[in-house]
Amino acid sequence: MASMSPRICGTWNQNGWLCSKMGLHITSQTQKCIPCVDKEDLKSETLGMVVKAGNATAMRAIVTTETEEDITLVTECVGKIYNLEETDKNVWTLYGEPETTCIVNQPATVELTCATLVNRIPQLIDAPAGYVTTDQFPYNEYMVHPMNCYVKSK
């Protein structure tokens, strides 16, 4: 059997991006991956198979980022096969004064991901040559006019 190297979840990059946007300086970052199982067989249309009870049906990736400013970011991303009682949701909780939680039930994940990428095209055209990380881009904006109206380097 081939050995498997550890995988870094997208949440790892997300924490770095958030810290950069907030002017925080990262001192350490760790990721913990936790496999999840279901008590019943789950049919996956995407995989074209039934995953037997007790086999992995999900992975929780928990990334903890410590900063010089004594602010800790803990983010979690779960990729899974849903059982009949489950739906996708995004939950963000900011701990502090006041504690705030935002929950988006059944987000349009595919559409939101595609819209975010497409709306970045004018910024990509305007970006300097070379490798530029997205934390250096301006904030994304909703385009109400044709895309070419947002290209500034014409």
Report residues per predicted region:
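C-terminal helical cap and adjacent loop that interface with cofactors, partners, or active-site loops
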Residues: I81-K154
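Active-site-lining helix/loop region of Rossmann-like oxidoreductase modules
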Residues: M1-K80, E85-D88, P107, C114
